[in-house]
């Protein structure tokens, strides 16, 4: 774990990167005319400033727990790539949960030392996915683990039946779009869930090895 003055020095360097990357995102917003400039300034000073503080807090909580030396982390290319890309993405969301996943990805990029191509793909997927994408992917990793799911009451049915029992607020049309995304991206192994199967099939794991690896990357 990074402690004391060493951690404070490292934290300041990381937060400097956050500041620079955040400003880079802001500078990419086209501004022209007095009204547009005024709106831009309000957004920058309020919503985006709040997001930057949320992101700094999420990073600090996780970085302080890394078991390593300052030099090892500072010289890790995967960590640096994840930090810069995730900072840019954090400015695009107001959801704390999404920022938490991004911060987890930064830490895990160091812990797992993922090669850069896969690292960039995973971070891009995290940018693309909504919280519901991740919720559904986590469900299909292990349907039996979810509270409120009574495995004994089913003999035949569709895996969707269990999902909608656990998450009754899900919209069916939105779910179809989300599940198609997950399938096309190679996160799940079953294309069509509109099928009837035995109870063991209903509760079967449906994430692929790539989907499992992606979940490990964004969770702590």
Protein language model regions, located:
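Membrane-inserting effector segments that mediate pore formation, membrane fusion
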Residues: 6-58
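Short acidic/histidine-centered micro-motifs embedded in hydrophobic/aromatic stretches
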Residues: 38, 42, 76, 86, ...
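Amphipathic, membrane-active segments
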Residues: 45-89
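N-terminal leader segment of winged-helix/HTH proteins
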Residues: 80-111
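Long, helix-rich, hydrophobic modules that act as membrane-proximal anchors or helical bundle/coiled-coil regulators
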Residues: 99-220
């Amino acid at each position: 774990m990074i402690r004391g003055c060493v951690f404070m020095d490292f934290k300041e360097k990381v937060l400097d990167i956050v500041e620079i990357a955040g400003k880079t995102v802001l500078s990419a917003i086209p501004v022209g005319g007095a009204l547009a400039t005024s709106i831009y300034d309000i957004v920058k000073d309020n919503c985006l400033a709040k997001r930057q503080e949320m992101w700094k807090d999420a990073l600090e909580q996780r970085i302080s727990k890394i078991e390593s030396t300052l030099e090892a982390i500072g010289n890790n290319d995967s960590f640096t790539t994840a930090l810069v890309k995730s900072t840019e993405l954090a400015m695009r969301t107001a959801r704390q949960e999404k920022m938490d996943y991004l911060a987890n990805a930064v830490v895990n990029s160091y812990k797992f030392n993922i090669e850069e191509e896969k690292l960039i793909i995973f971070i891009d997927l995290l940018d693309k996915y909504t919280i519901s994408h991740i919720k559904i992917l986590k469900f299909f990793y292990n349907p039996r683990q979810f509270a409120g799911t009574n495995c004994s009451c089913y003999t035949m049915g569709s895996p969707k039946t269990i999902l909608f029992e656990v998450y009754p607020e899900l919209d069916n049309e939105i779910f179809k779009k989300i599940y198609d995304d997950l399938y096309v991206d190679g996160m799940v192994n079953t294309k069509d869930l509109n099928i009837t199967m035995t109870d063991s099939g209903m509760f079967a794991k449906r994430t692929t090895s790539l989907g499992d690896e992606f979940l490990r990357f964004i969770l702590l």
